From Swiss-Prot:
It is found in: Nucleus. The gene is HOXD10. The modification Phosphoserine is found at residues 238-239. One of its GO terms (biological process) is anterior/posterior pattern specification. Residues 208-217 have a biased composition (Polar residues). This is Homeobox protein Hox-D10. Residues 242-253 have a biased composition (Basic and acidic residues). Belongs to the Abd-B homeobox family.
Amino acid sequence: MSFPNSSPAANTFLVDSLISACRSDSFYSSSASMYMPPPSADMGTYGMQTCGLLPSLAKREVNHQNMGMNVHPYIPQVDSWTDPNRSCRIEQPVTQQVPTCSFTTNIKEESNCCMYSDKRNKLISAEVPSYQRLVPESCPVENPEVPVPGYFRLSQTYATGKTQEYNNSPEGSSTVMLQLNPRGAAKPQLSAAQLQMEKKMNEPVSGQEPTKVSQVESPEAKGGLPEERSCLAEVSVSSPEVQEKESKEEIKSDTPTSNWLTAKSGRKKRCPYTKHQTLELEKEFLFNMYLTRERRLEISKSVNLTDRQVKIWFQNRRMKLKKMSRENRIRELTANLTFS
């Protein structure tokens, strides 16, 4: 004798009636069929949805092979109580609007959609009491997340809850605002850098103005330079300040006033001596590298230079000769050596 799988054995009335029928041999009735179990009104919500009709057998009759149980619907009002697609429904709390995900019996079923265990829910509920009321916005019912066994994913609900919790503190709000608007935080630094750049741009402009004035004055200086040189040649002055002024005026006159095509590359050399003066000094230097005081005075009068100017020129010429001789010696040594 077989029973349907959905029939519960929790009702004592049904179990007792079956046992008594088997003991009193009233189980084998002479009627054409037997109806079991009898209907009862106190079955509650866990009622049987099917019932079986078994054909009756006489005593000591061999069980027929083709005998089977005819299944008929029982308690039809239960079908309207449940969903059409489900056989049983578990009521959800009022705060949880997320539907549960059903699995087969051999798979561990989780009741929550957002992938949190019971322990995790308890911990979070202690920190954020209104967690379940904030969930439906971030976890929509239309496209719920399916919990995968063995994995833990940090859903968006946890992030939104944390950000709402942190936004109460001023530090958290400031950091969030800095992350949302990084350009606004860098504005003071940019303004300081812009001020420095403006200062640097203003300095060259102010520096270019005196150069323009010197360029304008340079043609006049060129015209007056030969006269000044002739006057200096006639009247010999021993002060070094006059020499420095003369060299500065020559440097100003040498500044290129023409366009960039005629400009010369490289550093402009100081040439306070004329070609005639340098030629006479070079002749004397080849004859004698070191001068006495009397000979130096004679040369200074002949070349229209001061005693100090002639002395400095000879010192510089000796240093130049020394440098040239050193370079020539190094060049000869490197030429004789063979590198493997």
